Amino acid sequence: MGIKHLYQVISENAPDAVKTGEIKNHFGRKVAIDASMSIYSFLIAVRSDGQQLMSEAGETTSHLMGMFYRTLRIVDNGIKPLYVFDGAPPKMKGGELAKRSARKREAHEAHEEAKETGTAEDMEKFSRRTVRVTREHNEECKKLLKLMGVPYIDAPTEAEAQCAVLARAGKVYAAASEDMDTLCFEAPILLRHLTFSEQRKEPILEIHLDKALEGLGMDMAQFIDLCILLGCDYLEPIPKVGPNTALKLIREHGSLEKVVEAIENDPKKKYVIPDDWPYQEARELFFNPDVRKADDPQCDFKWESPDVEGLVKFLVTDKGFSEDRVRNGAARLAKNLKTAQQSRLEGFFKPVAKTDAEKASMKRKHDEKIEEQKKRKKEDAKAKKEAKARPRGAV
């Protein structure tokens, strides 16, 4: 799930933190990818007639199809991917996982009912909600990656946290995930949409943590408190506290301790803290997640030549893929993983640090831009209100 509305908050209040671009812009870079999130998206997206792809033996192959062809696309564009798999979830995540499981059961029942009475759209919608990544899906994807010569590592708990460690250490350029909580684990750069299909034509989003903090006017501790208040995987959100309110509360009070105190002492009782809301524990999970250090031997990785015959046996003989396509893909892998060794020019130049005056000027321009946006919103709201109040037919 990640952090609710965090991308909206950053894009509206720290627009300089977000860059959009094409996948080819990341040529020559190493990227750590949240494998479990990617596999989930493959199971949802790689479908035929609303159903997951199956082998002749009735085994699901959507995850393998997605992993093979999306990884090929990444490598074709000169990127060297490293996949990171989730380990056991933190205990605090148990409540959220239980809720997801309950929602999936409800969706499964609704899907069965839609088969009898609903439309094709209803069936597709509820079918997608029943999807979950199993241990077997993970193991098959690991086998595939090994045959492709693409490295992977197993995280002790959260894959996003491990990706962030590798990015902070400079072992990869960025962490790639659709989960915005990757930023809470202090990933310097987060890439979104990297494993999307080419047909979706979604630009790659590149989110820079330092610019997000600068634009929001927060330090890392306040940013994590904001994310907890927005709603994370570890705690249920405070009812009626949306993104604008969460941002206002953190800016006004500076920390969750003071926010909670203000809410509890409010005579109007506008907001109510849930009975069991251990935000200090959630904060600790973001600050000190269970991860392997970047110099851990298990975090050593390298890209190798694909095992062509092994791929043919696994994907063609066992899973029913097209042999021509698999062999063609293996040839592209072998060629492009070598090409990706080329260095980017930026690696030879050290960026020049901005002066205090330049930073102040950038902040002033940013503040003026935000004020202008607020002014436009007020004017639009006023115009809509006047239009509604105007008698029908009046000019």
Curated annotation (Swiss-Prot):
Region feature (Disordered): 94-124, 356-395
Composition bias, Basic and acidic residues: 356-389
UniProt keyword Cell cycle, yes or no: no
Residues covered by region (N-domain): 1-104
Annotated residues for binding of Mg(2+) 2: 179, 181, 233
Modifications made to the protein after synthesis: Phosphorylated. Phosphorylation upon DNA damage induces relocalization to the nuclear plasma.
I-domain as annotated region, ranges: 122-253
Cofactor(s) recorded in Swiss-Prot or TrEMBL: Mg(2+)
Residues given in the record as DNA binding sites: 47, 70, 158, 231, 233
CC cofactor note: Binds 2 magnesium ions per subunit. They probably participate in the reaction catalyzed by the enzyme. May bind an additional third magnesium ion after substrate binding.
Region (Interaction with PCNA): 341-349
GO molecular-function term, one example from the UniProt record: 5'-3' exonuclease activity
Enzyme Commission designation: 3.1.-.-
Class of the enzyme per the UniProt entry, highest EC level: hydrolase
Amino acids binding Mg(2+) 1: 34, 86, 158, 160
Matches recorded under InterPro entries: 5-3_exonuclease_C_sf, Flap_endonuc, HhH2, PIN-like_dom_sf, XPG-I_dom, XPG/Rad2, XPG_CS, XPG_DNA_repair_N
Top-rank taxon, per record: Eukaryota
Subunit structure comment from the entry: Interacts with PCNA. Three molecules of fen1 bind to one PCNA trimer with each molecule binding to one PCNA monomer. PCNA stimulates the nuclease activity without altering cleavage specificity.
Family as reported in the entry's similarity comment: Belongs to the XPG/RAD2 endonuclease family. FEN1 subfamily.
Listed name of the protein: Flap endonuclease 1
Organism, scientific name: Talaromyces marneffei (strain ATCC 18224 / CBS 334.59 / QM 7333)
